[in-house]
Amino acid sequence: MIKKIGVLTSGGDAPGMNAAVRGVVRTALSEGLEVYGVYDGYLGLYEGRIEKLDRSSVSDVINKGGTFLGSARFPEFKEVEVREQAIENLKKHGIDALVVIGGDGSYMGAKKLTEMGYPCIGLPGTIDNDIAGTDYTIGYLTALNTVIDAIDRLRDTSSSHQRISIVEIMGRHCGDLTLMSAIAGGCEYIITPETGLDKDKLIKNIQDGIAKGKKHAIIALTELMMDANELAREIEAATGRETRATVLGHIQRGGRPAAFDRVLASRMGNYAVHLLMEGHGGRCVGIVKEQLVHHDIIDAIENMKRPVRSDLYQVAEELF
């Protein structure tokens, strides 16, 4: 029977992580369990930075961005000896199970701990929305609002200067954030891992728009597709129209979480505790068609694929 639960946040921070931690802590305490916070993710787990949490520990955090527990990249966690030390640190506090909030790298750590016999539940905390088995990840919709706000501001100045603007948006190998931002922000062109980049077609479309009297354009580009500044130089050389790239960077991860992310994170944190109490381990939580679900964490990492939103790409194609 579970008596003590640990919780950590790992990888890139996402708005709503604090709400998720709060959901875990308050639910566990309501069920008569003890809760321990692990500071700075798997690094802190390895170094033994673990402290008992109470209700006041998570007071006034639901509205704050980032994660008060801290987070850190710690690739050394893939080493067996490192994980053995981490488990030993959990056992020192009598912690029976762990809730891990983060992206696919964090899930991999939870998977490894599960394989070593330590029950873990994963919660999807990443602005990239690239986790299989869930329609939305914690932080995604807040980041979407942040990106749209930036696009709106860029459109103002691009229009004033008759300029083409490229907006580089986070997402790694998933174009969801770029796609939704482009639709909501009224972008003229979109480049994501799912669409690829036909540079000749892009330049021709821009030239056609200029010929029809279009004064400015916004291009939404997913990070890692190509160098945004190099693309800007090529477009300017081909069209004669001033072109500038704006890399939004880590501003997309910050800020007060939107109401949706606060509620989603709270629900997921609550659900994770109940899963552990029911004897589940090695699972990850998602939301599908507004219903909370859980999957085998190994399947989420290795077998499940996020569906390409072909319907929304069709909408984007017709609107752009």
UniProtKB/Swiss-Prot annotation:
Positions annotated to bind ADP: R22, G23, V24, V25, R26, R155, G186, C187, E188, K212, K214, K215, H216
List of catalytic residues: D128
GO biological process terms, semicolon-separated: canonical glycolysis; fructose 1,6-bisphosphate metabolic process; fructose 6-phosphate metabolic process
Top-level enzyme category: transferase
GO molecular function per UniProt: 6-phosphofructokinase activity; AMP binding; ATP binding; fructose-6-phosphate binding; identical protein binding; metal ion binding; monosaccharide binding
CDD domains, per database record: Bacterial_PFK
Assigned keywords, A-Z: Allosteric enzyme, ATP-binding, Cytoplasm, Glycolysis, Kinase, Magnesium, Metal-binding, Nucleotide-binding, Transferase
Residues that, per the record, bind Mg(2+): D104
Locations listed in the record: Cytoplasm
Enzyme Commission code: 2.7.1.11
Metabolic or biological pathway, per its Swiss-Prot or TrEMBL entry: Carbohydrate degradation; glycolysis; D-glyceraldehyde 3-phosphate and glycerone phosphate from D-glucose: step 3/4
Transmembrane parts of this sequence: none
Cofactor needs: Mg(2+)
Keyword Signal included in the entry's annotation: no
UniProt binding sites for ATP: G12, R73, F74, G103, D104, G105, S106
Regulation of catalytic or functional activity: Allosterically activated by ADP and other diphosphonucleosides, and allosterically inhibited by phosphoenolpyruvate.
Binding site for substrate: T126, I127, D128, R163, M170, G171, R172, E223, R244, H250, I251, Q252, R253
Gene Ontology terms: cellular component: 6-phosphofructokinase complex
Main function: Catalyzes the phosphorylation of D-fructose 6-phosphate to fructose 1,6-bisphosphate by ATP, the first committing step of glycolysis.
HAMAP family: Phosphofructokinase_I_B1
Similarity comment: Belongs to the phosphofructokinase type A (PFKA) family. ATP-dependent PFK group I subfamily. Prokaryotic clade 'B1' sub-subfamily.
Subunit note: Homotetramer.
Name this polypeptide is given: ATP-dependent 6-phosphofructokinase
Encoding gene per record: pfkA
